[in-house]
């Protein structure tokens, strides 16, 4: 089991899925898989077949979370990508939860508690070195602060 900066290095530099299991995590069946989705380029980046197969193999329910810090600002692309995710995963019939928090970790923690999520799924996106100076990686934050297993799948592009 890896945790911390070594873990995030592995996640960022490998092409295979990485399962991060916190040291204080106790084994339990996977009944609910939560996906923290940013709804950016979902059709091009989401490994939908792998996710669908995994969810079916575990016989779990999938709940998709999107955190929109400003719910008053209507974004047609956000709505479109929500519809696309529903279409991509129609065989597993995911539930959707649009949350609104300034803090991503708080949003994720409350989502996990509300839906009793057993495993969190993330798809880390490649960012430029310059972008990484100004934007904190959500995957990195979760790797350091999650209390449930975190499955990191490589983005398709």
Where would I find each of the regions flagged by the language model?
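Amphipathic coiled-coil/heptad-repeat helices and related helical stalk/stem segments
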Residues: 3, 47, 81, 104-105, ...
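Glycine/small-residue-rich hydrophobic helix-like segments
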Residues: 73-127
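A conditional alpha-helix N-cap/helix-loop micro-motif detector
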Residues: 44, 101-102, 132
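Conserved short-loop catalytic and cofactor-binding motifs
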Residues: 35-39, 96, 127-130
């Amino acid at each position: 089991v890896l945790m911390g900066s070594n873990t995030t290095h592995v996640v960022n530099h490998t092409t295979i899925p990485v399962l991060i299991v916190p040291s204080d995590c106790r084994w339990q069946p996977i009944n609910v898989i939560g996906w923290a989705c940013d709804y950016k380029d979902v059709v091009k980046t989401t490994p939908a077949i792998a996710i669908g197969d995994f969810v079916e193999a575990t016989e779990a329910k999938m709940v998709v979370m999107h955190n929109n810090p400003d719910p008053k600002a209507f974004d047609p692309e956000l709505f479109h990508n929500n519809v696309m995710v529903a279409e991509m995963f129609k065989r597993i019939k995911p539930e959707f939860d649009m949350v609104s928090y300034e803090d991503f970790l708080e949003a994720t923690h409350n989502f996990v508690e509300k839906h009793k999520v057993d495993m969190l799924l993330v798809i880390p996106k490649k960012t430029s070195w310059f972008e990484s100076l100004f934007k904190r990686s959500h995957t990195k934050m979760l790797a350091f602060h999650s209390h449930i297993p975190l499955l990191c799948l490589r983005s398709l592009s």
